[in-house]
Amino acid sequence: MVTLYSSPSTHSSGPVASYSNSSIGLYNYHHNKQIAVSSILSRKFGSLQINQKPFWNAVRMQDGAVATPPSKIENETPLKKLKNGILPVAPPKEQKDTIDFDSNKAKSTVSITVVGASGDLAKKKIFPALFALYYEGCLPEHFTIFGYARSKMTDAELRNMVSKTLTCRIDKRENCGEKMEQFLERCFYHSGQYDSLENFAELDKKLKEHEAGRFSNRLFYLSIPPNIFINAVRCASLSASSAHGWTRVIVEKPFGRDSESSAALTRSLKQYLNEDQIFRIDHYLGKELVENLSVLRFSNLIFEPLWSRQCIRNVQFIFSEDFGTEGRGGYFDHYGIIRDIMQNHLLQILALFAMETPVSLDAEDIRNEKVKVLRSMRPLQLDDVIIGQYKCHTKGDVTYPGYTDDKTVPKDSLTPTFAAAALFIDNARWDGVPFLMKAGKALHTRSAEIRVQFRHVPGNLYNKNFGSDLDQATNELVIRVQPNEAIYLKINNKVPGLGMRLDRSNLNLLYSARYSKEIPDAYERLLLDAIEGERRLFIRSDELDAAWSLFTPVLKELEDKKIVPEYYPYGSRGPIGAHYLAARYKVRWGDLV
């Protein structure tokens, strides 16, 4: 009897690639299609011919790390071992020619390239987040940051631009100026076109100069419009990817406009990158209260038994901004509020909220459960959608412009700046429970929150104390994502004194009162996760497909039928149609009660 041993494959965030000194073990592990083991056994160890055609240059490991060849080994050595009944594969520590990534970790470097470095997102979010990570000591010892854009700029000019947006944490001001100087010294700039292989090759040369022979890993953050980032991915992959370490690319939304364009975008990305190299970022998944959602649910016994249709009457996901498009009208008009907020931010939060308990906290296990939820949802129907658009409004001496007053927006635009929708999950846990979404611009307040309204108490002894309006007795769990992060539970309580008078009180966890430490920005968490290879908060391609399949039909119907949005004044609570939509399912919007 012959026993073949081989080391298990390694799937870690780092570029670990271990190979046997045995040619047979190597081919059996990485190229088993080239060796028919069964035919070898059937010949009872007759003459053994091994095709040793090199294939190392074609082998690219997870995250783009390139496999390196083992030392040349004569055929008779593994053959003798095979005839003796065992074919061992040496463990990594015994392989002299394999790169020891653990020992090289201290010698490795991370090069971070912000593509589109002169844009608002880079200046306001990405560079400040990178500085915050540096300030907290979260970045690797050896790192370099490069800005890349078409604008002509020197290193000094980039540093001056970036320095204007950097701030130190409120709770840690020590050595702020010194830390800024140290950080800015690591920042450099290279000007080039996004579709130029030559310009990216020049960037690669500069990166290698700063990497100084260290084991290099590279992260590209694409802070550029989606119509040009495929060219940037192609050039970065072909001209500036890491030779031996990992190469990762962060891609900003929007990920297409519908199912078809999103799928085409994914196909284009996968011409140059593996799925493991693509980090589709949705910064709302990096919000503290969103990340805490699974902790709240799965580590507290009082919530998990209630987390189903038996106890929950409806769930509301509410997003509101107190300002209009203001400078982004041209971009926004191409997408609208449903694509900009609902299809990504709110739907991702819904998937985290409604998913089943994952097998583990591993990224793939969590994302598998999210995909199951999305695939269980009914495609959104036009009757379950209300759209609106804000109009000019004068308050006192101040006049606020309407959406179409923006010079970059067509005067006859029907693009919604507000939308409300009712969605349903057809599975055993959530059957019949309405999941309501509401998102809008130029509303009366800025907030993002999750509201869980529980069912009425059957046979409630105190119903008479609430009169005919039983909604006043509804228990409600509120998770306020922004601003002033908080979790509070609305309960019914007796008012102190004689008699029996009830009111609703809040059991309140206000983060600013409970925790003295400032909450990190979402971009800090997501950038750190990308550097460490943690994919839990990033969107997988099948998640994206499932999400678009829910919204694409209704988006097409809205545009084909040229549905006119309901107009609402700038600074108001939104169109009245949203109330009628909620009332159809016997629900009141919790933020308007």
Swiss-Prot record:
A Pfam family it matches: G6PD_N
Disulfide bonding pattern of the chain: C168-C176
Gene3D superfamilies assigned: Dihydrodipicolinate Reductase, domain 2 (3.30.360.10), NAD(P)-binding Rossmann-like Domain (3.40.50.720)
Residue numbers binding NADP(+) 1: G116, A117, S118, G119, D120, L121, A122, K123, R150, K253
Catalytic reaction list: D-glucose 6-phosphate + NADP(+) = 6-phospho-D-glucono-1,5-lactone + NADPH + H(+)
Residues at which D-glucose 6-phosphate binds: K253, H283, Y284, L285, G286, K287, E321, D340, K441, R446, Q482
Active-site residues, Swiss-Prot/TrEMBL: H345
Predominant localisation class: plastid
Enzyme Commission number, as recorded: 1.1.1.49
Residues annotated as binding NADP(+) 2: K438, R451, R480, Y488, L489, K490, R573
Tree of life domain: Eukaryota
Keywords annotated in UniProt: Carbohydrate metabolism, Chloroplast, Disulfide bond, Glucose metabolism, NADP, Oxidoreductase, Plastid, Transit peptide
Subcellular location: Plastid, Chloroplast
Annotated metabolic or biological route of this protein: Carbohydrate degradation; pentose phosphate pathway; D-ribulose 5-phosphate from D-glucose 6-phosphate (oxidative stage): step 1/3
One GO BP annotation of this record: pentose-phosphate shunt, oxidative branch
Annotated GO MF terms: glucose-6-phosphate dehydrogenase activity; NADP binding
One term under GO cellular component: chloroplast
Regulation: Regulated by metabolites. Post-translationally inactivated by cysteine-mediated redox modification via the ferredoxin-thioredoxin system in the light and this avoids futile cycles with photosynthetic CO2 fixation.
Assembly: Homodimer.
Family in the record: Belongs to the glucose-6-phosphate dehydrogenase family.
Family annotation (NCBIfam families): zwf
HAMAP family cross-referenced by the UniProt entry: G6PD
Function: Catalyzes the rate-limiting step of the oxidative pentose-phosphate pathway, which represents a route for the dissimilation of carbohydrates besides glycolysis. The main function of this enzyme is to provide reducing power (NADPH) and pentose phosphates for fatty acid and nucleic acid synthesis which are involved in membrane synthesis and cell division.
Annotated protein name in UniProt: Glucose-6-phosphate 1-dehydrogenase, chloroplastic
The organism of origin for this protein: Nicotiana tabacum
Lineage start: Eukaryota, Viridiplantae, Streptophyta, Embryophyta, Tracheophyta
